[in-house]
Curated annotation (Swiss-Prot):
It is found in: Cell projection, Cilium membrane. Pore-forming subunit of the olfactory cyclic nucleotide-gated channel. Operates in the cilia of olfactory sensory neurons where chemical stimulation of the odorant is converted to an electrical signal. Mediates odorant-induced cAMP-dependent Ca(2+) influx triggering neuron depolarization. The rise of intracellular Ca(2+) levels potentiates the olfactory response by activating Ca(2+)-dependent Cl(-) channels, but it also serves as a negative feedback signal to desensitize the channel for rapid adaptation to odorants. The olfactory cyclic nucleotide-gated channel is an heterotetramer composed of CNGA2, CNGA4 and CNGB1b subunits with 2:1:1 stoichiometry. Olfactory neurons. Widely expressed in brain, enriched in deep cerebellar nuclei, olfactory bulb mitral cells and cerebellar Purkinje neurons. Expressed in olfactory sensory cilia (at protein level). Residues 1-51 are annotated as: Disordered. Residues 339-342 are annotated as: Selectivity filter. The channel activity is inhibited by L-cis diltiazem. It catalyses: Ca(2+)(in) = Ca(2+)(out); Na(+)(in) = Na(+)(out); K(+)(in) = K(+)(out); NH4(+)(in) = NH4(+)(out). This is Cyclic nucleotide-gated channel alpha-2.
Length: 664
C-alpha cells in the first residue's frame, strides 16, 4: 500500500485482499505510529482519495483471524483523516506585503534598573512572569474589562440613588441588593489591581515595568478616587441599620471607568454618530432619574399630600405602591426638565428653589440636545449634502448648455450608481491627513489584490510598488462607454476591479472576448518597448457592458515612478519583451537593429567620454608640470637665499671676533 502510494498507482478494491496491513499503523502505541508513518502522513496531505480507499478496504469482509487488527487500523485511519481535515492551515505570507513592510517590529518594553550577575537571572525570570499580566490599554482584553467594570458603575449610579430615596425598593429586595452590592465591590477591587497592571506608552513604547506602572497610577487623582470608592463604609450598617444604602454613596466615585468605556466604544464603533446620540440620551435619562428621586425625597421631607406640588398622600391606594411612586416622580421630572408640560405650581420656598434649579437644568439639557443632535445630523448628512451639491451643479451646467435629455439621463444614472454603491468618497481627500507611510500602507492593502494581477509588476521592487499603488486612480465607466478604441495612442493601463468589458469589433456589436474582474490591459503599450509590433497604439476596441470600476495607471505616472528605479525599469522592459515574445508580438529584427543602434550609440558615447577624459587628463598633466616647475624654481630661490644667509653669518662672525693680545 505504501509502495503504491509513493509510485502514484492506486490499487483497486479487488486487489486489496492480498495486501498486508500497512506497517505504519500498529496497535502497540502512538510512538510506533508516529515514527513509521511520517512519510505516509506527508503524502496523505495532498489527496484524501487514498484514505477513502483504505476506508473502503476496512469495510471489505475478510475471512479468518485479524478482526481486532482491522478495527485498530480503522480507528487509526479515521483519526489521521480527522486530524488532517481539522488541522489549521498556516496563512501563506504575502510577498508583496513582506517586501513593503519588511520584518515585523518586535514588542519593545522599557524596564527600570540594570540587572547584574547570576542573582539577576532569577529576577529576570520573575519579571517576565509579571509582564505576562500587564494589559495593553489598546488591546481587546482591556476593552472587554472596561465593559465589565462599566456595568457595576452604572448600577450604582442608577439603583443606589433610587434605593436611598425609595425605601420600599430597598426593603422589598434587600437580599438582591446585598448580592449585587458586594459583587460590584469585588469588581471594583479587581479593577484597582488591574489598573496597577495596565501598561502605558512612553515615547511610543509600551511600559511593562511594575514599579513604573505602580508609580504612574498612584500619583494620579483617579487612584485617590478609586481608593475612596472601595472604603468599607458598609460598616456603618451596624450603627444605622442595613436599610440605609446612602452610606455606600462613595461607590459613585468610580465613574471615570464608565466614561472611558464610552470614549473607547465611540472610537471603535462603525456608527459613531448613532452611539453619540444614544450616549446623550443615556445621560439625560440618568439626570431625569436622579431628579425624580430628589423630588420624592423632598416630598417625603415636606410631607406627602401637604400641598398640590408634593407627591400625593401614600395612604391613598392609587398612589401607595412602589411602581406608581417611581413612575409619577419620573413623569414629573420629565415634564419639569423638558419644560414641555404643565406641573402643579410650588407653594413653599424650598419648592420654588428646587423648581428654579430644575428649570435651569432643563434649559441646559434642551440646549445640549439641540446642539449635539443638530451637529450629529449635520455630520451624518455632510457627505450627502456635498454630493447633492455636485449633482445640482452638473444639472445646472447641462441645462445652461442645453444638453440632450438622453445625455442628461445618462449623467444622472451615473451619479445614482456612485451614490448607491458608495463610490462617492474621494480617496485623496480622505487620506490627505495621514503621513506618507500610512497612506502607502493603506493603498497597498486596498489595491494589493488588484496590482498583483498585472504580469509586469509581479517581481518589482517594494519601493516601486509603493509608488505605483499611490498613483492608481479609480474610474467608473457607464454602460456602453468605450474605454479605448482601436488605433488610439495608449497612455494608460487599466485593471478591472468590478464589472465586465467586451472586446468588440468596429461596429460595436460583435464581441470577440469578455474581460471580467481581475483582468488588465494596456500594460505593454505604456512601456514603449522597442520592437513591439503594436507600438504604443491600441489594437482593439474595449467597451463597458454595464457599470465598470477600473483602476487606471497613466504612462506619465509610471515613467515618473521608474525614474528613481533604473534597475526596476530594465526589469519591467525585459519582462515586457518576454510577454511580447511569448505572444508573437515582438519583431526580433527590429529588436536586433535597435540593439545594434544602441551598441553604436554606446560606442559613440564611450568615445566621447574617452575624448573628454583625455582632454581632462592632458589639462591636469599640464597643470601638474607647471606646478612642478614653479615648485622647483621656488626651491632654487630658497636654496640660494639660505646659502647667501649662511655666508653672511660666517663673515659677520669673522669680523666680530677680537685679535689675541701679546700677554696672552
Amino acid at each position: 500500500m505504501m509502495t503504491e502510494k509513493s509510485n502514484g498507482v492506486k490499487s483497486s478494491p479487488a486487489n486489496n485482499h492480498n495486501h498486508h496491513p500497512p506497517p505504519s499503523i500498529k496497535a502497540n502505541g502512538k510512538d510506533d505510529h508516529r515514527a513509521g508513518s511520517r512519510p505516509q502522513s506527508v503524502a496523505a496531505d495532498d489527496d484524501t482519495s487514498p484514505e477513502l480507499q483504505r476506508l473502503a478496504e476496512m469495510d471489505t469482509p475478510r475471512r479468518g483471524r485479524g478482526g481486532f487488527q482491522r478495527i485498530v487500523r480503522l480507528v487509526g485511519v479515521i483519526r489521521d483523516w480527522a486530524n488532517k481535515n481539522f488541522r489549521e492551515e498556516e496563512p501563506r505570507p504575502d510577498s508583496f506585503l513582506e517586501r513593503f513592510r519588511g520584518p515585523e517590529l518586535q514588542t519593545v518594553t522599557t524596564h527600570q534598573g540594570d540587572d547584574k550577575g547570576g542573582k539577576d537571572g532569577e529576577g529576570k525570570g520573575t519579571k517576565k512572569k509579571f509582564e505576562l499580566f500587564v494589559l495593553d490599554p489598546a488591546g481587546d482584553w482591556y476593552y472587554r474589562w472596561l465593559f465589565v467594570i462599566a456595568m457595576p458603575v452604572l448600577y450604582n449610579w442608577c439603583l443606589l440613588v433610587a434605593r436611598a430615596c425609595f425605601s420600599d425598593l430597598q426593603r422589598n429586595y434587600f437580599v438582591v441588593w446585598l448580592v449585587l452590592d458586594y459583587f460590584s465591590d469585588t469588581v471594583y477591587i479587581a479593577d484597582l489591581i488591574i489598573r496597577l497592571r495596565t501598561g502605558f506608552l512612553e515615547q511610543g513604547l509600551l511600559v511593562k515595568d511594575p514599579k513604573k506602572l505602580r508609580d504612574n497610577y498612584i500619583h494620579t487623582l483617579q487612584f485617590k478616587l478609586d481608593v475612596a470608592s472601595i472604603i468599607p463604609t458598609d460598616l456603618i450598617y451596624f450603627a444605622v441599620g442595613i436599610h440605609s444604602p446612602e452610606v455606600r454613596f462613595n461607590r459613585l466615585l468610580h465613574f471615570a471607568r464608565m466614561f472611558e468605556f464610552f470614549d473607547r466604544t465611540e472610537t471603535r464603533t462603525s456608527y459613531p454618530n448613532i452611539f453619540r446620540i444614544s450616549n446623550l440620551v443615556l445621560y439625560i435619562l440618568v439626570i431625569i432619574h436622579w431628579n425624580a428621586c430628589i423630588y420624592y425625597v423632598i416630598s417625603k421631607s415636606i410631607g406627602f399630600g401637604v400641598d398640590t406640588w408634593v407627591y400625593p398622600n401614600i395612604t391613598d391606594p392609587e398612589y401607595g405602591y412602589l411602581a406608581r411612586e417611581y413612575i409619577y416622580c419620573l413623569y414629573w421630572s420629565t415634564l419639569t426638565l423638558t419644560t414641555i408640560g404643565e406641573t402643579p405650581p410650588p407653594v413653599k420656598d424650598e419648592e420654588y428653589l428646587f423648581v428654579i434649579f430644575d428649570f435651569l437644568i432643563g434649559v441646559l439639557i434642551f440646549a445640549t440636545i439641540v446642539g449635539n443632535v443638530g451637529s450629529m445630523i449635520s455630520n451624518m448628512n455632510a457627505t450627502r449634502a456635498e454630493f447633492q451639491a455636485k449633482i445640482d451643479a452638473v444639472k445646472h451646467y447641462m441645462q445652461f448648455r442645453k444638453v440632450s435629455k438622453d445625455m442628461e439621463a445618462k449623467v444622472i444614472k451615473w451619479f445614482d450608481y456612485l451614490w448607491t454603491n458608495k463610490k462617492t468618497v474621494d480617496e485623496r481627500e480622505v487620506l490627505k491627513n495621514l503621513p506618507a507611510k500610512l497612506r502607502a500602507e493603506i493603498a497597498i492593502n486596498v489595491h494589493l489584490s488588484t496590482l498583483k494581477k498585472v504580469r509586469i509588476f509581479q517581481d518589482c521592487e517594494a519601493g516601486l510598488l509603493v509608488e505605483l499603488v499611490l498613483k492608481l486612480r479609480p474610474q467608473v465607466f457607464s454602460p456602453g462607454d468605450y474605454i479605448c478604441r482601436k488605433g488610439d495612442i495608449g497612455k494608460e493601463m487599466y485593471i478591472i476591479k468590478e464589472g465586465k468589458l467586451a472586446v468588440v469589433a468596429d461596429d460595436g456589436v460583435t464581441q470577440y472576448a469578455l474581460l471580467s474582474a481581475g483582468s488588465c490591459f494596456g500594460e505593454i503599450s505604456i512601456l514603449n518597448i522597442k520592437g513591439s509590433k503594436m507600438g504604443n497604439r491600441r489594437t482593439a476596441n474595449i467597451r463597458s457592458l454595464g457599470y465598470s470600476d477600473l483602476f487606471c495607471l497613466s504612462k506619465d505616472d509610471l515613467m515618473e515612478a521608474v525614474t528613481e528605479y533604473p534597475d526596476a525599469k530594465k526589469v519591467l522592459e525585459e519582462r515586457g519583451r518576454e510577454i511580447l515574445m511569448k505572444e508573437g508580438l515582438l519583431d526580433e529584427n527590429e529588436v536586433a537593429a535597435s540593439m545594434e543602434v544602441d551598441v553604436q550609440e554606446k560606442l559613440e558615447q564611450l568615445e566621447t567620454n574617452m575624448d573628454t577624459l583625455y582632454t581632462r587628463f592632458a589639462r591636469l598633466l599640464a597643470e601638474y608640470t607647471g606646478a612642478q616647475q614653479k615648485l622647483k624654481q621656488r626651491i632654487t630661490v630658497l636654496e640660494t637665499k639660505m646659502k647667501q644667509n649662511h655666508e653672511d653669518d660666517y663673515l659677520s662672525d669673522g669680523i666680530n671676533t677680537p685679535e689675541p693680545t701679546a700677554a696672552e
